[in-house]
Amino acid sequence: RIHIAATHRELENFFNALGKRTGKVKNVLICGVGGVSYYLAHQLQHSRMHVKIIEKDYARCEKLTELLPEATIIHGDATDHDLLLEEGIESADALVALTGMDEENIIMALFARTQNVPKIIAKVNEDSRAQMVEGLGIDSIVSAKSVTADAILCYVRARWKSIKSANVETLYRLVEGKVEALEFLIRQ
């Protein structure tokens, strides 16, 4: 496994030099709705991506239709592979599994892999589950606990560093948490 730190432009040039074309993400399928799903869908639409959301809860679907009028909202169970096929999972550029159940998210992500979805992201609440599925073809496993812990750690470090005239803006954990990359705001 290789980890690279570079600007977006440098990464594009790097992959082009290797002959690996990085396709732009245009169609994103989000499975499951919560605060993160709404925020993500809003940001993706702002970036001119088409967003399709599948959600079990009818009331949430109605609310999303009002909040995200340009998104396609589907009332249904995203763990139903027939529904995913009907909704064109094979033509999605990315699938994001954000239900409240780790197992459902992992199953959807693995099914997306069989459908050759180029980018697959699944949210898990238990770090042990993230470790179990590593290497199974899911591009990104996002641990809710790790993201929260990183945000708190970043805040604490920013408060500590503010005395020394530099604030930590962003904290990234890489290589299974063995490496940290910090983005600082330096004041003159």
PLM regions and their residue ranges:
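Cytosolic regulatory regions of ion transport systems
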Residues: R1-Q188
